Amino acid sequence: KCRECGNTSPSCYFSGNCVNGKCVCPA
């Protein structure tokens, strides 16, 4: 879901959302 966000933690990469080029992880 967050492929375009660049370097992010694996958990954020798979479960997070991209907002303005940054990975926003669910609470």
Swiss-Prot record:
It comes from the Eukaryota. Expressed by the venom gland. This is Potassium channel toxin alpha-KTx 32.1. The keyword Transferase does not apply. The keyword Calcium does not apply. Its main location: secreted. Belongs to the short scorpion toxin superfamily. Potassium channel inhibitor family. Blocker of voltage-gated potassium channels. Inhibits voltage-gated potassium channels Kv1.2/KCNA2 (Kd=0.96 nM) and Kv1.3/KCNA3 (Kd=1.3 nM). Does not inhibit Kv1.1/KCNA1, Kv1.5/KCNA5, Kv11.1/KCNH2/ERG1, KCa1.1/KCNMA1, KCa3.1/KCNN4, NaV1.5/SCN5A, NaV1.4/SCN4A or HV1/HVCN1. Strongly inhibits the expression of the activation markers interleukin-2 receptor and CD40 ligand/CD40LG in anti-CD3-activated CD4(+) TEM lymphocytes. One of its GO terms (cellular component) is extracellular region. Keywords: Disulfide bond, Ion channel impairing toxin, Potassium channel impairing toxin, Secreted, Toxin. It is found in: Secreted. Disulfide bonds join C5-C18, C12-C25. GO terms for molecular function: potassium channel regulator activity; toxin activity.
